[in-house]
């Protein structure tokens, strides 16, 4: 019983250990520069306020807003596509869900909620 354990320990001690170095694919300054360029390219996107204004505005106001955006940002000339409709739908669903959540009492408790195994909700404290 002791012999196999000693044999394993001896084999582990005798195995050569290679030291390996880890290197990044790019220099950190290149990565920071890439991230900065990436963020600058998305500066022209609509903000949440613009999206809310589009959702709440009348159709004639919306055409004025989209034409002004197209003048200001040429990238937005063809932007009224499924992506914009998807974002509008998500914003509308989020606004619709907020009162419903508070009515059910989902936000009670100090530590949040727990979904039990059978699917019932229970508070985690206070």
From Swiss-Prot:
Disulfide bonds join 110-126. Residues 23-104 form a propeptide. Its main location: secreted. It is found in: Secreted. Residues 1-22 form the signal peptide. Transmembrane segments: none annotated. GO terms for cellular component: extracellular region. One of its GO terms (molecular function) is hormone activity. One of its GO terms (biological process) is cGMP biosynthetic process. Keywords: Cleavage on pair of basic residues, Disulfide bond, Hormone, Secreted, Signal, Vasoactive. Exhibits natriuretic and vasodepressant activity. Has cGMP-stimulating activity. May help to regulate body fluid homeostasis in a variety of aquatic environments. Belongs to the natriuretic peptide family. This is C-type natriuretic peptide 1. The lineage of its organism: Eukaryota, Metazoa, Chordata, Craniata, Vertebrata.
